[in-house]
Regions:
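Cell-surface/extracellular proteins and modules involved
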Residues: 1-170
Length: 170
C-alpha cells in the first residue's frame, strides 16, 4: 500500500527503446516535525516481544496495510536495523558482532545526573569519575534495543488526513 502512493515513470535501463513503467522509489517524504510533536495526534506505545509494524498496524489501525504509517511516524526506514529486535534476534545479532569475551568487556562508564525530578545516566571517563558504573557491551546493546521499544502511533481519527497529505506530497 505504501508504494501505491508513489508516482510512476517510464524507465529504459538498456537504452534500447523498450522502456517499462516503474514506481519511482527515489521519491522521499518526511513527516512534518510539528505534526510529530502534536501529542494530541499520537498515542505512546511499547512494542511487545515479536511484534512487527504490520501486527501493530493491524491492532491499532485495524489493518496491517498501514504498517508504513507506523514506520514513517517513528523515523524507521529499515525494519531490520531500526526496529526493536526480539530476544532471539538480539542474541543472534550480539553473537555476530561480539565474541563471548567481548560481550562482558566495558563499553563505557556512566554516572547519574539529577535535574529536578529527573535522573538520567550520562557517559563519563572512568579516570574523571572513579565512582562511575561500568556498562558492558552486552548491557549497552540491550539498552539501545530497548530504546526502540517506545514508539508513537498516529491516532485513528488523523489517519485519513495523514494518508491524504502523504498522497499529495508524493
Amino acid at each position: 500500500m505504501y508504494f501505491n502512493y508513489f508516482p510512476t515513470t517510464m524507465y529504459d535501463p538498456a537504452g534500447d527503446g523498450s522502456a517499462k513503467m516503474v514506481t519511482n522509489i527515489m521519491k522521499r517524504v518526511r513527516v512534518r516535525t510539528n505534526m510529530k510533536k502534536e501529542i494530541v495526534m499520537m498515542d505512546p506505545y511499547d512494542v511487545k516481544e515479536n511484534e512487527t509494524p504490520e501486527i501493530i498496524s493491524d491492532k491499532h489501525h485495524g489493518s496491517p496495510y498501514y504498517h508504513w504509517v507506523v514506520m514513517l511516524m517513528n523515523d524507521i526506514s529499515d525494519v531490520n536495523h531500526d526496529w526493536v529486535k526480539s530476544t532471539r534476534q538480539m542474541q543472534k545479532y550480539l553473537l555476530s558482532k561480539y565474541t563471548e569475551t567481548q560481550l562482558t568487556e566495558t563499553h563505557h562508564y556512566e554516572i547519574p545526573q539529577t535535574s529536578g525530578d529527573t535522573t538520567t545516566m550520562i557517559e563519563v571517563e572512568n579516570t574523571t569519575y572513579p565512582s562511575a558504573t561500568a556498562v558492558t557491551n552486552y548491557e549497552y546493546e540491550v539498552a539501545l534495543n530497548e530504546e526502540k521499544r517506545s514508539i508513537d502511533l498516529l491516532r485513528n481519527e488523523y489517519l485519513g488526513y495523514f494518508t491524504e497529505e502523504f498522497s499529495d506530497l508524493v
